[in-house]
């Protein structure tokens, strides 16, 4: 990620953080994000309006999970207000990185994200989607180190550590629910594996063999793969 992009994200994170501070000072404990799209029913290329209940559509995605380490202990230690500030800085920074890599946020969990790359409706090829997901994970950690944690440290707030997991594979998209309560869900082994790698990772990106095999090759590449259990840790090459 270029220094210019890092600086752009730094400004966005700072705005989100200061907005959260202003909210606290006014004692308005409420969510302040405005989004152009609802995360639910957000599988790329699929809509609840056009799918039938029990539908079975097959697609392929690179799947990324990022999750905060020791988030429960951290929240208990620093308290609700500092957790509130931390999450506004963290989520805004992560969403900017996802956007820069053409990812689609499928879910915002309490302390992390699930993101899809590629698919039938995406302009990205299979290999491009795989590379985008892996590089997104690396850049997420870079933004945490270089943007978010310095901001938190300035206010004596416990720094954030995250793990990232990435896999690629078949995904089944289906519409689940009843007539007035329903959602579009993605199901697949690659989702489970990406989540598993995320749980194992600490301040690193762990990817599957499928990601390793599909990664575009180039001489003097900037990324190398280090074997870890049944996956690989993405590391800087050169």
Descriptions of predicted regions:
Residues 43-48, 147-149:
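Short gly/ser/thr-rich secondary-structure transition/capping motifs
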Residues 1-46, 202-238:
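Intrinsically disordered, glycine/charged-rich C-terminal tails and inter-domain linkers
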Residues 120-237:
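Catalytic beta-strand-to-alpha-helix segment of the class III nucleotidyl cyclase homology domain
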Residues 14-24, 40, 68-73, 120-125, ...:
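Short low-complexity stretches enriched in small and charged residues
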Residues 50-132:
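Catalytic NTP-binding/metal-coordinating core of nucleotidyl cyclase/transferase enzymes
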Residues 12-18, 34-36, 56-63, 157-160:
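Short acidic/polar alpha-helix capping motifs at helix-coil junctions
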Residues 38-41, 59-63, 104-109, 160-165, ...:
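Short, functional N-terminal and low-complexity linear motifs
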Residues 17-43, 71-91, 131-145:
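Charged, low-complexity, helix/coiled-coil-prone segments
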């Amino acid at each position: 990620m270029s220094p210019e992009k890092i600086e752009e994200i730094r400004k966005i994170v700072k705005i989100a953080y200061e907005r959260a501070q202003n909210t606290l000072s006014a004692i308005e404990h409420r969510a302040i994000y405005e989004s152009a799209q609802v995360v639910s029913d957000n599988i790329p290329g699929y809509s609840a309006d056009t799918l039938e209940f029990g539908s079975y559509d097959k697609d392929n995605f690179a799947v990324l999970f990022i999750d905060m380490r020791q988030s429960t202990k951290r929240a208990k230690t620093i308290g609700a207000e500092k957790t509130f500030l931390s999450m506004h800085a963290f989520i805004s920074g992560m969403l900017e990185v996802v956007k820069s890599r053409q990812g689609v946020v499928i879910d915002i969990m309490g302390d992390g994200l699930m993101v899809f790359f590629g698919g039938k409706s995406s302009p990205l090829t299979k290999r491009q989607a795989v590379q985008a997901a892996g590089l997104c994970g690396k850049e997420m950690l870079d933004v945490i180190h270089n943007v978010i944690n310095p901001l938190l440290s300035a206010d004596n707030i416990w720094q954030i550590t995250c793990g990232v997991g990435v896999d690629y594979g078949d995904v089944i998209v289906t519409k689940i629910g009843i007539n007035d309560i329903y959602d579009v869900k993605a199901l697949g082994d690659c989702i489970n594996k990406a989540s598993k790698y995320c749980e194992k990772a600490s301040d690193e990106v762990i990817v599957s063999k499928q990601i390793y095999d599909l990664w575009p090759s180039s001489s003097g590449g900037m990324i190398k793969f280090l074997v870890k259990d049944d996956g690989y840790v993405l590391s800087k090459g050169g």
